C-alpha cells in the first residue's frame, strides 16, 4: 500500500494505474521481487503515483482490507513532505492505517520512506525524523518493520538513492533490494510464529 515507490515508478504502472494487470517493466516494482522469491505468495501492488498519506488512507478499505490479506506493507509520506505537509499529519495517517489493518486481523509492516536526489537538507531532516518515528512507533504498536530506505540509499550519501533512472525512484535493482528486504521481514515473522 503506497505511492509511486510501491507502484514501481518510473518503469511500471501499477494495476490500479493501468488495469487490470499494470503495464511496463514488471521488475520495476518490489511486489514482483517478493513473488520471485516466494512463488507461493500473491503480492498485490496497491501503489498510486503521487499520492499523499491521506489519499492512501482513504483507499485502505477498498485496496487492502477487502482483499483479505495476511500482511500489509504501509509505505507512505514522501509526497506529503514534498508538498510541505506536517510530520504530525503524516504520522496520524500512518497510525490510522496500521490500527485499522490490525483490527481487521492483518499484520502490518511499517516501511521507511525513501529519499530523492533533489531533496534539500531541510527536507532530508524531515525525512530522517519521519523514518526515526516510523521505526519507534512500529516497536510501540508491535508492527513489523523494514528499513526500505536503507536498502536503496547511497551508502556514502543517505540523502540520495544509490541507483535511480530519474533521481526520484529506485531502478529495478533497487526495487529488487526492497523486495528482498520486505520478504525477509515476513519470513522472519513466520519463523517466529512457528517457533512460539
Label every PLM stretch briefly.
Residues 28-39, 52-196:
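Alpha-helical cap/lid subdomain in secreted, periplasmic
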Residues 21-23, 48-52, 123:
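Short, flexible loop segments at the rims of nucleotide/cofactor-binding pockets, characterized by
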Amino acid at each position: 500500500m503506497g505511492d509511486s515507490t510501491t507502484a514501481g515508478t518510473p518503469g511500471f504502472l501499477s494495476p490500479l494505474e493501468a488495469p487490470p494487470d499494470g503495464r511496463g517493466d514488471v521488475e520495476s516494482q518490489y511486489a514482483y521481487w517478493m513473488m520471485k522469491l516466494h512463488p507461493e505468495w500473491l503480492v498485490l501492488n496497491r501503489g498510486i503515483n503521487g499520492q499523499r498519506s491521506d489519499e492512501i488512507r482513504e483507499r485502505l478499505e477498498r485496496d487492502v482490507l477487502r482483499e483479505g490479506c495476511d500482511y500489509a506493507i504501509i509505505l507512505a509520506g514522501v509526497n506529503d513532505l514534498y508538498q510541505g505537509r506536517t510530520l504530525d499529519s503524516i504520522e496520524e495517517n500512518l497510525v490510522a492505517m496500521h490500527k485499522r489493518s490490525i483490527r481487521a486481523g492483518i499484520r502490518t509492516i511499517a516501511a521507511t520512506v525513501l529519499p530523492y536526489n533533489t531533496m534539500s537538507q531541510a527536507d532530508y531532516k524531515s525525512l530522517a525524523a519521519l523514518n526515526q518515528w516510523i521505526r519507534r512507533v512500529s516497536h510501540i504498536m508491535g508492527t513489523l518493520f523494514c528499513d526500505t530506505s536503507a536498502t536503496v540509499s547511497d551508502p556514502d550519501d543517505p540523502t540520495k538513492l544509490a541507483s535511480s533512472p530519474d533521481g526520484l525512484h529506485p531502478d529495478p535493482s533497487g526495487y529488487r533490494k526492497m523486495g528482498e528486504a520486505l520478504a525477509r521481514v515476513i519470513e522472519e515473522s513466520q519463523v517466529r510464529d512457528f517457533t512460539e
